[in-house]
Amino acid sequence: MKLWSIKGNTQKLDGGAMFGNAPRAMWERWARPDAANRIDLACRALLASPLNGRTVLFETGIGAFFEPELRQRYGVQEDRHVLVESLHAAGFEHEDIDVVVLSHLHFDHAGGLLAPWAEGRAPELLFPNATYLVGAAHWQRAQHPHPRDRASFIPELPALLEASGRLELVDGPHSRALGDAVRFSFSDGHTPGLMLAEIVGPMTVDGQPHGGVVFCADLIPGRPWVHLPVTMGYDRNAELLIDEKRAFLEDKLARGVRLFFTHDPECAMAQVVRDDKGRFAAAHEVAELRARPLAA
């Protein structure tokens, strides 16, 4: 099995919102803001093939579904569907994808499911041959969002996914589509039912898989958020998220599971370590994956 990091459309969002209650004097060491206080963000997907005999895409980024006014409001930098172009550059088309795994349905993670915006055209799903995996608890949230996060969802998307006949809701550690090859866990600090997907590693120690890769989604958007106290203003429950992040990182450190970041503009994957003060940190950083073996 090989892994690719697949670039999607990029964003610029307010740095204060991305770093919660961390002061600018701290976070600007990690991300340089522009004149409008916005920082650069990637919307990176992970491609794995063959995984359980399938070609699997973990998330789709923000895509190009926004009309021009909303694209500007949310800082989307390109009007074309960059993820589809990046798939092509890696030797794949969106029709080749067998499974799309979605950590959650916020637009910056699921917008790439849709064709680019065009005047007068209704939203249209891409990936016509793929099974779409969504966490069952988060599916309920997407259908009945809270006023605080309603704007983060694409109103038409749940109905389109359901009408496709290829939606699988996941409510445990494994899915029908991917079997034992991918292990799922769930988090509620960012959004209810956030689904974290771990590609199971090649080694087993004391009955536990070692050496895989986990898609961190918005539990840990990039390297700065590996630090336990750092959360986003977008998180619904920062204290819960910190507790979930601690347990998550302790587990991944113990089992040698690498972290894959979706929003870090410079780093696709890293190893979690403890620094000389015992704090979690990212090390052995990898900027891009190009047909990289899982065990490499």
Regions found by a protein language model. Give the residues of each.
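Metallo-beta-lactamase
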Residues: E78-F92, D96-D108, E124-F186, L240-G256
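Conserved beta-strand hairpin/beta-sheet module of binuclear metal-dependent hydrolase folds
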Residues: K2, N9-A90, L196-D218
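Cap/insert and terminal regions of metallo-dependent hydrolase folds
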Residues: Y74-E85, P202-A296
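Short, P/G- and charge-enriched loop/turn segments at secondary-structure junctions
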Residues: W30-A36, G120-R121, F184-S185
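Active-site metal-binding loops of divalent metal-dependent hydrolases
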Residues: G8-N9, T60-G63, L105, A137-H138, ...
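Residue-level marker for buried hydrophobic side chains located in beta-strands
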Residues: V56-F58, V101, Y132, V213-F215, ...
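Metal-dependent catalytic neighborhoods of phosphoester/phosphodiester hydrolases
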Residues: A110-A122, Q271-D275
